[in-house]
């Protein structure tokens, strides 16, 4: 069984005095972080948490959550990371499904079925001597993260130590590493994008500037004053930052804006090019331990809309009806690599359907061009089929977002007796604009069947904690209308 030294322990040994985590309030070195984690381990040992057991973690970004995630790995327990924005019912369902033995939280939460401990209680509680894992077995499960369940009930994605290691290595081979690197972390750590930064932090020995909750003003300031070199964003965050930037630009020390969470509108990318902001578009999911494809900033304008090529250890192909498709033919995106999950917890059928001979069927639609660059069209489940024609919501959203008075746009399919489905749009506007004007604007830029049949105006669009658009909630709004 392949093993490695315990990552944080090894990092604390190699570069003990280097800053690991910085927040508004404090800075902590790798050695101090390791000591803090060992202390939390002794508290957890008193609670009888043991290797192989599953422990639910319901916490917001902060030093406490970082300590808990590392402490569980020191013990060999599996962290089941819960989304703080879920309803009580959803959280209870996931805890039961994951068979957790207890819940560690920084919130007031009282499930009936398992013991609940707040971080404060744990940290101030009794301690017990503990055997720490000095080595990690790469085949063992480290975390379980539930997919958002765009179709059916959420599924617990098992990610091993090996998956997390391969993900960090693949990213570093793509982006490179610098001594002065500082990654600004504003993505929630219960999502794989946020969690992967914790892994990179200790593997690379890289400073992480931790932002507990999404705060565009602080992030904008930090990029200018805190030596931030890399930041992970989604399109909505990038729009917020550009708004604050106005006619200015960011310092040249910012070498990478890693943009994920779905296709980005062209006008947004063009604005970034004008300002010299290096945007790396990326494609990934929970099942791939975060990114699996990335487009470097060199190709920002020549390959607008592409998510790039697979990371060095990964492979990608397009399949349709079980056959591999040539370039420029649409189909399902299928990926393979050491960062890809081995499957879903207690969901053998879903695992067998999704992962075939190591190839993960993503459920996303796309194509590769003649040079092998990936273009993600949409989620298969978001596809609108109107009169036999495939309509990708992302394409209509891009057109809507190019209108000067549109801040946000979301498109979903509505049942239609004649066509099966027709597209309708939800828009957040920045000034006076009517439904008729929006429809006319689209008619000039889109095929007739792609033009939204209705446009509804909202104050804001529903998004998850990573600021990804929640189309299923737009569908619910549509049903209520």
Curated annotation (Swiss-Prot):
- EC class of the enzyme, as a word: ligase
Keywords from UniProt, A to Z, are:
ATP-binding, Ligase, Menaquinone biosynthesis, Nucleotide-binding
Asked if the record carries the keyword Nucleotide-binding, the reply is yes
The superkingdom of the source organism is: Bacteria
Gene Ontology molecular function terms on file: ATP binding; o-succinylbenzoate-CoA ligase activity
Keyword Oxidoreductase (UniProt): no
Catalytic activity, as annotated: 2-succinylbenzoate + ATP + CoA = 2-succinylbenzoyl-CoA + AMP + diphosphate
From which residue to which does the signal peptide run?
Answer: none
What Enzyme Commission number(s) does the record list for this chain? 6.2.1.26
This protein's pathway = Quinol/quinone metabolism; 1,4-dihydroxy-2-naphthoate biosynthesis; 1,4-dihydroxy-2-naphthoate from chorismate: step 5/7; Quinol/quinone metabolism; menaquinone biosynthesis
Its BP terms in the Gene Ontology are: menaquinone biosynthetic process
InterPro entries found in the cross-reference section: AMP-bd_C, AMP-bd_C_sf, AMP-binding_CS, AMP-dep_synth/lig_dom, ANL_N_sf, MenE
Tell me the function of this protein. Converts 2-succinylbenzoate (OSB) to 2-succinylbenzoyl-CoA (OSB-CoA).
What family does this belong to?
Belongs to the ATP-dependent AMP-binding enzyme family. MenE subfamily.
Q: Which HAMAP family match?
A: MenE
The name this protein goes by in its record:
2-succinylbenzoate--CoA ligase
User: What species does this protein belong to?
Assistant: Bacillus cytotoxicus (strain DSM 22905 / CIP 110041 / 391-98 / NVH 391-98)
Gene that produces this protein: menE
């Amino acid at each position: 069984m392949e093993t490695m030294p315990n990552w944080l322990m090894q990092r604390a040994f190699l570069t003990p005095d280097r800053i690991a985590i910085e927040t508004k309030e404090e800075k902590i070195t790798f050695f101090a972080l390791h000591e803090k984690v060992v202390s939390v381990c002794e508290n957890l040992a008193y609670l009888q948490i043991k290797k192989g057991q599953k422990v639910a973690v319901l916490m917001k970004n902060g030093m406490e959550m970082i300590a808990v995630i590392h402490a569980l790995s020191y013990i060999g327990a599996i962290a089941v990371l819960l989304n703080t924005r879920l309803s009580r019912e959803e959280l209870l369902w996931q805890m039961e499904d994951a068979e957790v033995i207890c819940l560690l939280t920084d919130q007031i939460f009282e499930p009936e079925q398992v013991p609940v401990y707040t971080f404060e209680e744990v940290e101030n509680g009794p301690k017990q001597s503990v055997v720490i894992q000095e080595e990690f077995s790469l085949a063992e499960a480290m975390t379980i993260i539930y997919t958002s369940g765009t179709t059916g009930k959420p599924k617990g994605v098992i990610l091993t130590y090996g998956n997390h290691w391969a993900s960090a290595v693949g990213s570093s081979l793509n982006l490179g590493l610098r001594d002065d690197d500082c990654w600004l972390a504003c993505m929630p750590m219960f999502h794989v994008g946020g969690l992967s930064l914790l892994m990179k932090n200790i593997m690379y020995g890289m400073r992480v500037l931790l932002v507990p909750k999404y705060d565009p003003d602080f992030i904008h300031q930090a990029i200018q004053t805190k030596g931030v070199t890399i930041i992970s964003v989604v399109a909505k965050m990038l729009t917020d930052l550009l708004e604050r930037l106005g006619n200015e630009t960011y310092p040249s020390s910012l070498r990478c804006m890693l943009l994920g969470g779905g296709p980005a509108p062209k006008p947004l990318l063009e604005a970034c090019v004008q300002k010299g902001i290096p945007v790396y578009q990326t494609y990934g999911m929970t099942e791939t331990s975060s990114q699996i494809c990335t487009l470097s900033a060199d190709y920002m304008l020549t390959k607008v809309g592409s998510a790039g090529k697979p990371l060095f250890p990964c492979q990608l192909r397009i399949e349709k009806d079980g056959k591999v498709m040539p370039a420029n033919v649409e189909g399902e995106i299928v990926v393979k690599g050491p960062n890809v999950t081995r499957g879903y917890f207690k969901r053998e059928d879903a695992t067998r359907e999704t992962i075939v001979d190591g190839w993960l069927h993503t459920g996303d639609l796309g194509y590769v061009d003649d040079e092998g660059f990936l273009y993600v069209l949409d989620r298969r489940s978001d596809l609108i089929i109107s009169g036999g024609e495939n309509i990708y919501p992302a394409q209509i959203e891009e057109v809507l977002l190019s209108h000067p008075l549109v801040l946000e746009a979301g498109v979903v399919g509505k049942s239609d007796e004649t066509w099966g489905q027709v597209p309708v749009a939800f828009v957040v506007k920045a000034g006076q604009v009517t439904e008729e004007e929006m429809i006319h604007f689209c008619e000039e830029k889109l095929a007739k069947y792609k033009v939204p049949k209705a446009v509804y105006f909202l104050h804001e669009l529903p998004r998850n904690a990573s600021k990804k658009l929640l189309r299923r909630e737009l569908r619910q709004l549509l049903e209520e209308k």
